[in-house]
Amino acid sequence: VSSYPGDFEYIDHTIAMEHVMNAEEQKILETVDSLRDDIIDFTLRLVAQPSTLGQEEGAVQVMEEELQRLGFTTTAIPLDNKALAEHPGFAPTPWQTGTRKNIIGRRPAQAEGGKSALFNGHLDVVNAGSPELWSNYPFSPHIHDGWLYGRGAGDMKSGVAAMTYSVHALDKAGFGLCAPVTVEAVIEEECSGNGALACIAAGYEAEAVLIPEPFGPTILTDQVGVLWFKVSLSGKPTHVLEAPSGVNAIEKCYPLFTALRSLEARLNETNVPEAYKDMDHPLNLNIGMIEGGDWPSTVPSEASFHARLSYFPGTDYTTICNIIESTITKCAQQDPWLRHNMPRVEFYGFRSDGHSLSRDLPALTTLDQCHMSLTGKQAESYISTCTTDLRAFHWYTNSQPTCYGPIAENIHGIDERVNLESVMQVARTYALFLARWCKLYQ
């Protein structure tokens, strides 16, 4: 399953050079291509780090060492939930932050006259599921037929490598920039967004923000809102020989699943923004985890499930929370047991409102022009049915943010992989963007 809506075209960049405006830009692109092995090697080293929730330290260390080796000035930004708690974008989480951190690399401006840029990418990855279902161990990355396989290969460590080396390419080609550039590698993108938020709270922003999410060489203009929630239920335990006298908490989840599915259907049909009207089912409910019971021969007294639900731009987090709580309450009131033992709803993790962007923003226009210089045609718009860290920059900074990234398949699934030529396309486009947006200095 690919995240990219189109067909990727392998571009002959000797022909594409005809669209590039000057010799300086041609030299930059040639330098990017000379760094192909470095970009792939960096991706392999990042993917080899199993940076699931709470285990990101290895990947962060690899990132920090690479930035320092390439001459960036680095700063660690701790993920401190207590310090972030008062921020309107903060997402409460039940897990501890400990000493976990994000890492920032900076290249200062060498002159004035350009506009600042920030590249953001996340180092955390989702769990690999059942490793035995993979062709190879998920954190032993390998390359086959132009694709790099491994958990996080597409989502989104290859993009992190591409954005890092796009900045380095200008330095290697002998060019400075007339505005500062920030490379930002964060954690908790997959669950809360607090990593990117911590960097924003620390003062890191720019006039343009590019995120190489694996949606292909497209320009993201719209994304849905997303939230997580947990529903806990109580039953009445008993030995199975007297099962009818007990109340099975796990089975009491079933009508709630049905009610939430009905809510999902209603949300997909109500106040649909123009960008989503041609989509068959843009909003999705996922019952992602279920827990309950402690013995096969005991009617379970407790059960809970965790879910993710998306909602359209224009609906805010508080409103959708109220709708979910109302849906659960109305369903429970129809059950003789649940109406006296109401399910408990807890919201945690993502509280991410959706948003829409104009393609006419100068940063998006410049990015599109760079894409056209390399491909000869305009980049497609991407209408996202998931959330990204883009939302934090949209809501809490004055940046012009979007996503433009490589082509990946099976993200969050088995045998996740990324197309390596598309990774190089990202690096070329980003380097060209820096030259035009930040302006060259030599």
For each predicted feature, which ranges?
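Acidic/histidine-rich catalytic neighborhood of metal-dependent amide-processing enzymes
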Residues: 148, 156-228, 438, 442
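Short, conserved micro-motifs enriched in small and acidic residues
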Residues: 148-161, 186, 247-251, 417-424
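Acidic-glycine-rich active-site phosphate/pyrophosphate-binding loop
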Residues: 128-143, 221-232, 370, 402
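Acidic/His- and Gly-rich active-site-bordering loop/insert found
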Residues: 18-148, 177
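N-terminal amphipathic/basic-hydrophobic helices that include classical n-h-c signal peptides
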Residues: 1-19
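Short glycine/proline-enriched loop/turn "hinge" motifs that connect secondary-structure elements
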Residues: 133, 176, 220-226, 296-300, ...
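Short Gly/Pro-enriched turn/cap motifs at secondary-structure boundaries
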Residues: 93-97, 220-223, 276-279, 381-383
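Metal-dependent amide/peptide-bond hydrolase catalytic core
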Residues: 18-27, 34, 69, 230-442
